[in-house]
Structures are given as structure tokens and as C-alpha cells.
Amino acid sequence: MEDGGKHFVFVHGLGHGAWCWYRVVAALRAAGHRATALDMAAAGAHPARADEVGSLEEYSRPLLDAVAAAAPGERLVLVGHSLGGLSLALAMERFPDKVAAAVFLAACMPAAGKHMGITLEEFMRRIKPDFFMDSKTIVLNTNQEPRTAVLLGPKLLAEKLYNRSPPEDLTLATMLVRPGTNYIDDPIMKDETLLTEGNYGSVKRVFLVAMDDASSDEEMQRWTIDLSPGVEVEELAGADHMAMCSKPRELCDLLLRIAAKYD
């Protein structure tokens, strides 16, 4: 990393992995910055199975460990996509001094003083019964109460997530997605005292609106933003839900502007 370079840490959404950030990571590294894309537990190339990960905390452990391990004085730019916003929130609450800025890309962005699951619950309330299309629900074999995961189907990926992305990225996704859980029934999602103004609320937040998102539409994204007055808002014109694939250059430019603003 060149002198003055930033360290960006990326967190994927449901069913995806570090692999979905490959275009953005390559561009940022070429520009002299450090870029780390993580696999959450039981996602991407992470060795755990979905039935072995019982909570949002366990799922987010790779991010929490990475932020905890940041060098003294190093302040990270965290970037979370979709469900990855919930993992960002946990890291921000726990390590606010280690985060220069948190970027929520068409993401679940909780509000300080409200329960963690508020935006995810609203999203689930808004979607139609057939939203998940050809996705498959998988019953997980656990020692706890029965839980389910979803394997995103090729049709859903094509029509709701990658609808403006290159066909190569859609093909890659159909090969690499894994069953994922949103942890909406995790007790932590109901805790209204978890995210505080003093920690989570003290970190600079930027919400990036994917303007052509066919999954979490603009109205839902604006609803999320309205929960947190004062959050900076940027727009990615022509971006589908997978903005890192459909608009990688524009996303990189925005991230560099954000990183330069919040040091």
C-alpha cells in the first residue's frame, strides 16, 4: 500500500462471498489502496456450514476479528452490501474508534436506539410472496430450534440482483452462491439497546442508493435512510442491487471520495 492509501474492508450480502467484490478490490489496489474482502461465516470460501452458524454474531465473526486486529491508529473504511450492513453495525458499535467511515451499499442500515432488525423486517414486510422466485428453502440440521436458509435461484439472481450487471458476473454468481440465513429470528435483532449513539451513532455513515435496484427498490432504500437523519447519501445511477458488478468504476470513485473526506 502506498503512503496515504486507505484500507477498505468489504462485506457481502446474503448467499454471496468475498468473490463478488473482485472488480472493486482490483481497482482500489491498482490505485494504491489496501482492499480486503471478507467471507462471513459459512459464506464464500469460509469452511463452516450454515447449520454450524447459529447467530448474527457468529456469522459476523470474520469482520469483528478483522476490525479488532487493525493496527493501532489505523482507521478502516467499512463497506457493507445488503445484509452485510448488519455485520457492519456490530463492528461499529464494538470498535467505533477503528472505523473512519461506514458505507452502506443498498444495505440494511439500522438506526441507533432502535432494534437491529428494523430495516430487514420492513424489507420482508414489503416484498411479495413470490419474491424469491426459484430460490430454494433449506431446513438446517441443528441441535437448536429448526432454522432455514435460502439458496438464491438463477432466475432471481438474473431478474432482481444482477439485472444490469455483465452476464459473466451473473454466471459467476450462479456457480458460487451458498445457502444463507438472514438471522431475523436471532434475539439480538430485537435488542433496542444494542446500537448506541455514543458508539454506533458516532461513526460517519454514508448510504449509497442503487438507483436501478430491482430487489431493494429506491423507496425501501429511502425509508432506511429516513430512520437515521444526518446520514450522508450518494446515488449510483444505473446500478442494480449488485452495484459492485454493474457500476464498479463509479462505485470505486465514490468510495475514494468518501475515504478522502473521512480520515
UniProtKB/Swiss-Prot annotation:
Family membership noted in the UniProt record: Belongs to the AB hydrolase superfamily.
UniProt xrefs under Pfam families: Abhydrolase_6 (PF12697)
Location of the active site: 82, 213, 241
Upper lineage: Eukaryota, Viridiplantae, Streptophyta, Embryophyta, Tracheophyta
Name assigned to this protein: Probable esterase PIR7A
Keywords, alphabetical: Hydrolase, Serine esterase
Entry's EC annotation: 3.1.-.-
GO MF terms, alphabetically ordered: methyl indole-3-acetate esterase activity; methyl jasmonate esterase activity; methyl salicylate esterase activity
Protein's UniProt keywords contain Hydrolase: yes
Superkingdom assignment: Eukaryota
Biological processes per GO annotation: jasmonic acid metabolic process; salicylic acid metabolic process
Enzyme class: hydrolase
